[in-house]
Structures are given as C-alpha cells and as structure tokens.
UniProtKB/Swiss-Prot annotation:
This is Malate dehydrogenase. Catalyzes the reversible oxidation of malate to oxaloacetate. InterPro entries: L-lactate/malate_DH, Lactate/malate_DH_C, Lactate/malate_DH_N, Lactate_DH/Glyco_Ohase_4_C, Malate_DH_type3, NAD(P)-bd_dom_sf. Substrate binds at residues 80, 86, 118, 149.
Length: 309
C-alpha cells in the first residue's frame, strides 16, 4: 500500500497518475482536513472505474490507517505563495514535517519516505531526524522535477524531444540549484556542445525560475510536474526498478559532504537509495556545487532544534 500524506493539488495529482500507471492496488490519502481526503478518494475511485483500473483509493484523517504501508509520500505543508521564498517557509513546515515524521515512525516504521515539502532539502533533513530512519529510506523529491524542466527548456532550444535528453541538476532545490549542461547529454553529446553560451544561460535561468514562474502566472505552485515525478519515483520503489534519477538525499561523504541532504544522482529501488552516483565535476562546477551546499547548510542551521528530535 502507498500512503500519501497531504490531499492538496500535488498529493491528488500524484495519486491520480500512480493509479493510471497501476503502481499499486491501494492508495491511501491522509489529511488533517475533515472530508478532504475522503472526497478526493471518492472522486479518484470514480476515475478508476471509468478508466477500468484495478486501483482502490481510500481517504482518512487518522495516521494509524497508514499501518502496513511500504511507501509513504509526504506532500503536506504550508504552500508557497507568490513572492515567497522557500526560506520563509522553514519554521512552519519544519513543525509539520517533524510531526508527520513521528507518526510515520510509529505506524509505518519499515517504509520508504519520499517528501515534497519546501524548502525541500531542509525538510528532508527534518524528516531524517524525526523518523530516525537510515538515510537510504528518506528521500527528498526535487531532482526529477528540476531535471525534467531542464530537459524541457533545452529540448525547446534544440527542436528535439525532451525524452532524448539525460539531464543532471545538482545542489539545492531552490534558487541556488545547479543545472550541469556539461554532464547533461543527448545521445552522448553534452548540452554544452550543442547550445551556445547564451542559450545555455537562458536554459539554466528558465530551469531555476520555472517554479516561481508557475506560481506567478496562476497564483499557486506546480502540481502536475511534481505529481508525475512522484509517480516515477514510486514506480521505481514499488517495482524495484532501480532507476537512476536525481533526488535530495543525506550524503555520507559523497561529493565531500557529510550529514546534509543534497540533490544528486541516485539509484532508487524497493529499499530506497541503492547507490549515490558521484559524477566528476570541473573546478568551476565544483565551486558552484559547494556554494549550493552551503546555502543548504545555512538553511538547515535555522531549523529549531525541537523539530529535529
């Protein structure tokens, strides 16, 4: 069973796409708002019937119903508003994530946890601390979305399908994220060889600002992109597909970083992170990566200690 904590736009989009992909036969939605997860589950069950899917959705306001879940996806949290930075969300969402982490530890102690709550890397740290789980089972969703956006904007410049691009984005999920064109390939040819410096600069800028642009245009943050990315990650866990993808995970010496969640390439399977993939960076790329790491470290340092226990 998959449990999704948070029945807002991202959680329900993820639930719908997971059902369409037939990733699991039962998907539980949990939310603190009475009636919300139940209503979303009923609507999704109607969708399932119309599409002929063998998927059952259930809604609940009680964390104990997640018992038996092998995958818990956390999308709950205070939403990002227009003009708001991820950093402004820290204290409010740290409490939410810490509380949810304790419930997961109690009712689904063997689960793999994937979360989307912003600021993503800092909240991954809170979840890691509050659950006490090994780092392999606490994964921040970010890189699949960031890499997808990089592929989308680069493909538009090149006039090719985004599926032809193998994108790499490192560092922080946020304003200091670090797309790496020299390690992002189109059938073995790096983007840095296919695009001019001006084009690369535009692609990187569009990738970094994509989330804020969506929020500015429609008044609330993205949900379909994150929903699709979560479904891809869930599929890799549930089927033990061992896909290589980008995610925020606590590093234990990789890239010279210790005990800090950073967006890096990983292999994802049924036990969570199977392997962290280290790619060789140029001195300039390493400097940018380190700057992004320091931005994460600074943000983590602002988290109240009471939420890290």
């Amino acid at each position: 069973m998959i449990t999704i904590v948070g029945s807002g736009r991202v959680g329900t989009a993820a639930a719908a796409i997971m059902g369409i992909m037939r990733i699991d036969k039962k998907i539980l939605l949990i939310d603190i708002v009475k009636g919300l997860p139940q209503g979303e589950a009923l609507d999704l069950n109607h969708m399932s019937a119309i599409l002929g899917l063998d998927v059952e959705y259930e809604g609940s306001n009680d964390y104990k119903d997640m018992a038996g879940s092998d995958l818990v996806i956390v999308t709950a949290g205070f939403p990002r508003k227009p003009g708001m930075t991820r950093e402004q969300l820290v204290e409010t969402n740290a409490k939410i994530v810490s509380d949810i982490g304790k419930e997961i530890k109690k009712y689904a102690p063997d689960s793999v946890v994937i979360l989307t709550t912003n600021p993503l890397d800092a909240m991954t740290y809170v979840m890691w601390k509050s659950t006490g789980f090994p780092r392999e089972r606490v994964i921040g969703f970010s890189g699949v979305l960031d890499a997808g956006r990089l592929a989308y904007y680069a493909a538009k410049k090149l006039g090719i399908s985004p599926a032809s691009i193998l994108p790499i984005v490192l560092g922080q999920h946020g304003e200091s994220m670090f797309p790496v064109p020299s390690k992002s390939f189109v059938h073995g040819v790096p983007l840095s060889k296919l695009l001019s410096e001006d084009q690369l600069r535009e692609v990187v800028e569009e990738t970094v600002k994509a989330g804020a642009k969506i929020t500015e245009l429609r008044g609330f943050s993205s949900n379909w992109g994150p929903g699709a990315g979560l479904a891809i990650m869930a599929d890799s866990v549930k089927r033990d597909a061992r896909r290589s993808l980008i995610a925020s995970v606590v590093l234990k010496g990789e890239y010279g970083v210790f005990d800090l969640p950073v967006e890096v390439p990983i292999v994802l399977g049924k036990t969570g992170v199977v392997k962290v993939l280290e790619i060789e960076l140029t001195p300039e790329e390493k400097e940018k990566f380190n700057q992004s790491v320091e931005a994460i470290r600074k943000l983590v340092g602002t988290i109240p200690q009471s939420y890290l226990q």
